[in-house]
């Protein structure tokens, strides 16, 4: 959960640079990369517009995809409004729900994990509404400048209500890998 776009622009850029550095460090060894959601704090694709920013991450993902590395993106609860941008522009397969993969005769159930466990019925109801095609269609009627601003505001508001916080930059730096 990088939540790019959360907090200040500088903090978001710092997290993004660490993520890109990590991608650089694995590009010669990786065959498949699984991104497990919430790469962005808010992502909503309009038919002709996507949120601005994140150019370092998107460019690096495109580079790795162009190198032949398979990249699978499992949407999280902050970026599940993806349609076809990642597939068309970056050649990244997007999954809206967890999937079973088998590698070397071992099974792996891979996904973001939000709302899979017992309880949290309020979130599960909210997710049904927010992932409803009619609701998404209505939201697309809002101009992207207003819609993206509203989405970011609601994402921040949700964190304040739930007590959820993004991982601090200091925490990320402490766990940064050297290439």
Question: For each predicted feature, which ranges?
Answer:
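Active-site-proximal beta-strand elements of phosphoester/diester hydrolases
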Residues: 1-3, 107-114
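Core catalytic region of metal-dependent phosphoesterases/phosphodiesterases
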Residues: 4-103
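Surface-exposed loop/turn and secondary-structure junction residues enriched for glycine/proline
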Residues: 7, 43, 53, 103-104, ...
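Charged/polar, solvent-exposed surface patches and flexible loops
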Residues: 21, 63, 84, 88, ...
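Short, well-ordered, mixed-charge alpha-helical segments that flank or form enzyme active sites
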Residues: 80-84, 110-111, 117-120
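Active-site-proximal loop/helix segment associated with metal-binding centers of metalloenzymes
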Residues: 113-169
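Conserved small/polar residues in nucleotide/adenosyl-binding loops
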Residues: 170-177
């Amino acid at each position: 959960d990088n939540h790019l776009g959360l907090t200040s622009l500088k903090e978001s850029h710092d997290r993004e640079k660490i993520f890109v550095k990590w991608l650089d460090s694995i590009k010669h060894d990786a065959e498949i990369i699984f991104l497990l959601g919430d790469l962005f704090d808010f992502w909503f694709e309009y038919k002709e517009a996507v949120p601005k920013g994140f150019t370092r991450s998107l460019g690096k993902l495109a580079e790795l995809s162009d190198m032949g590395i398979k990249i699978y993106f499992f949407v999280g609860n902050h970026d599940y409004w993806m349609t076809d941008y990642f597939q068309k522009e970056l050649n990244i397969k997007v999954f809206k729900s967890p999937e079973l993969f088998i590698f070397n005769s071992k099974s792996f159930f891979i996904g973001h994990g939000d709302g899979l466990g017992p309880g949290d019925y309020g979130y599960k109801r909210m997710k049904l509404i927010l992932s409803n095609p009619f609701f998404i269609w209505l939201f697309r009627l809002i101009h992207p400048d207003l819609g993206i601003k509203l989405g970011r505001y609601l994402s921040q508001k949700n964190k304040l209500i739930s007590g959820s916080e993004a991982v601090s930059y200091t925490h990320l730096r402490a766990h940064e890998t050297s290439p």
